[in-house]
Structures are given as C-alpha cells and as structure tokens.
Amino acid sequence: MGIKHCCYILYFTLALVTLLQPVRSAEDLQQILPSANETRSLTTCGTYNIIDGCWRGKADWAENRKALADCAQGFAKGTIGGKDGDIYTVTSELDDDVANPKEGTLRFGAAQNRPLWIIFARDMVIRLDRELAINNDKTIDGRGAKVEIINAGFAIYNVKNIIIHNIIMHDIVVNPGGLIKSHDGPPVPRKGSDGDAIGISGGSQIWIDHCSLSKAVDGLIDAKHGSTHFTVSNCLFTQHQYLLLFWDFDERGMLCTVAFNKFTDNVDQRMPNLRHGFVQVVNNNYERWGSYALGGSAGPTILSQGNRFLASDIKKEVVGRYGESAMSESINWNWRSYMDVFENGAIFVPSGVDPVLTPEQNAGMIPAEPGEAVLRLTSSAGVLSCQPGAPC
C-alpha cells in the first residue's frame, strides 16, 4: 500500500472519529489534534496538507479538473461548485458591458443560472469595470493560466456552492453601482461596491483556495449578513491593512475555517476578525503582523490550532478584543490556543474555556498538525504554477 494511500486512510479515520463524537468536553477537544504517532504518520505524506493531498501530484489534473470538487475541507466541506455543469472557457479579458456581457467573458459565465466550471484559455489580466456578481453553483478555476483580477472584486451575494481557485486579485478599488448582469434574466440595479476583493453576503458553501490577494481599498475577504459554512485555505495574503472580516450581526451561528494560509509582507490586522460566530484557525503561517493577527467582538469562539506566529520586533500580542463589551465581557469569550508555535516573543492571551462543540461544529473541524509543521504545510500558499501534463 502506497504512502499516499496510507495518508488518505489516516485522514479518513480522524474525520470519522470526529463525526462520531456528538459533543466535546475540554478533554475531548484535544482529540481533533493528532497524537505523536499520528503526527509522524501525517508527516510521511510529503509536503501536501490534507486539501492539497486530495488532488495535487497528478499529471492529468487538466483532464480531470473537477476532481478538485471533492477536496473541500472545514466548514465548506461538500462544496462542489460547478462540478455538475459544463466547462465554460473564458476567451476574452474584456468587461466593457456589465449589463449585457458577451459570451466568452468571465462576467457572462459567472451570471448563468446553471452550474458551470469556469476556466481560462490563456494568461489574462481582467480589469473588472464593476464588481462581478457570481451566481449559484460556480467554480472559477485559474489553473493552467496566470489570471489576475484588478479594479473591482467578486460579489457572492445570497448564493451558495461557490469555489474560487488559483486566482490573483489586487488593486481593488471602490466602484459605482448601476445595472449589472447577475443572472440569466435582465440586468438588475446594484449599489456601488466598497472595495472588497471578495465580498460574501448571505452566502453559504463557499470555498476560496490557492488565491493570492493584496491591496484592496476595504477587505480582502469580507463575509457578512448571515454568511456561513465557508473555508479560506492555501491562500497568500500580503500588503494590506484589513484582511478577513467575518461579521454576523446576530447570533445565527456563522461557521468558518481559515486553514493553511500564509499572511506576510506588510499585513496589519483581521486574519480574521470575527463578530459572533465560530472559527477554526488551523495550521496558518502569520509573519510580523501590525496591530494584531486574530481579533473579534461580541463573543465569538476562536480556536487557534497548530499555527505559527512570528511576531515583529514591535508588536507581540497575537489577539485583539474589541467592541463596547470587550473590557468587561471578553474574559468569557472562548479564544483558545492549542499546539501553536510562538516566535520572536509572540504572545497569545487566551480567554474563556475549552468549548463543548455541537455536532455541526465537530463535523467541520480539520485535524490539526503541530505548529512546527506549518512551514511545510503552507509552502505552496497562493496561486500555483500548473501546466497540463505535469503535476501542479
């Protein structure tokens, strides 16, 4: 039996154990973390983390693109994007008619009412004239080309089942509203965008993987207004102040995963910042944040597991607690650290207790490796260079 096969069996076993546990006590919570023997077995899988190990290393990826749809982990697990639809190829960089886009443009494909797996014919720099409204059941797959999105970002509003993979987004600015194509019917009026690279509002089953994001006027990824069940994984975040803002305006139970990402090169805060909700922050690499790395308000649950925190010479504190009740109530917020690695004097001040997880929370947890493994697990964060006929 091959090493790779053994790794899959190990991960499946860990996931099965997770699913069979209805709730976790403080002691039970440690069971999502592998034992020393399990860690040694995981390490033999090579450089791939659990997500990349599902599809990378295969030379036929271009002929079998939709295999990626079986690889989502965390709270986006089960997200298949456009797997059940046709392949749609973007052949034009133009975005000169946002109300009635031409077939062959990214906007035309993203707006269709049917499932689509969207790919790109060649390297492209697409200057979006207005934010791009993405309809249900879409995969935007940049593998095999260098695809850059500039000027306006992606809008994932009140839709579900979306995969964004291997896309570069940078220099995103505020744009006016107007009549914009968002589905098969006539264009609809949309308000202006606030400068997010990826904005999620009321969306669910969203997976953002292997993207490189930098330099937006507002957030790199913002999720609000009832958004839930999304995973941000294997991404590279650089040169930005406000990175990931995950805000629920009531206690409906936002569930999100931040896994295997790298935050470096002049990043300041919100990696993520969570209001209400529950986030697993697992096996990420944080390097020299400005204000803080992990933050939140209004009593969110933050489980930090197996991350690497390399502090700058100026700012050492990993977490930031905010809001009117932060001083009086934050001592009860469940912000916990397990197997994290702290370098150059980095400090994580925990609060609350080890939470008892619901069955739904249990099902979305990714088994964490120790923080010492993070450099390996995040070594390919950001867009990949993928050529047909060779492994990515």
UniProtKB/Swiss-Prot annotation:
Its EC number is 4.2.2.2. The keyword Lyase applies. Keywords: Allergen, Calcium, Disulfide bond, Glycoprotein, Lyase, Metal-binding, Signal. InterPro entries: AmbAllergen, Pec_lyase, Pectin_lyas_fold, Pectin_lyase_fold/virulence, PEL. It catalyses: Eliminative cleavage of (1->4)-alpha-D-galacturonan to give oligosaccharides with 4-deoxy-alpha-D-galact-4-enuronosyl groups at their non-reducing ends. Glycans are attached at residue 37. The active site is at 270. Has pectate lyase activity. Belongs to the polysaccharide lyase 1 family. Amb a subfamily. This is Pectate lyase 3. It comes from Ambrosia artemisiifolia.
